[in-house]
Amino acid sequence: RGELRGGVVGTQMANLGLEKALNDLGIPFARSKVGDRYVVELLHELGWQLGGENSGHILSLSHTTTGDGIIAGLQVLRTMVERGQNLATCCEGMTLMPQVLINIRYQGQHDPLASDAVRQAMAQAEAVFAGQGRILLRKSGTEPLLRVMAEGENETQVREMAEQIAASIRAVTA
């Protein structure tokens, strides 16, 4: 409807299917670190209005500077009414890619991300995906967890790669 200024900001955890759907519509997509604060920072830096996180926080700077579920829900309902479509029809252009998230608790004595075995498992997964998927390995900002996220077109392959990386982390943190 011409109201979107610029593009959309998501986090590192945003599904590749969202990025592809927006790109297919000619809408730029940028990724920030995880957290509303980082989404807002990137929105301001780029001069854009709309962003969000997988947690469901949707930020529409033209309405508010924080995530507001009521405002986001009302905007979706308005679009549905204007188009005369149900939610499923409105979302037909987006197909989420298979995504696996494994959380691994660890003690803070050493950094598992610095391990050669973990780096080797990451490199192997990236080679298997060959540009058709991605791996994200990050520490939680709120608890002693490592998050292994894998996504790509082949669900079995995505799960296998995530589990291999998780196993390498468990081996060095045991």
Question: What is each of the regions a protein language model found here?
Answer:
Residues 2-174:
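Phosphate-binding and adjacent anionic-ligand microenvironments
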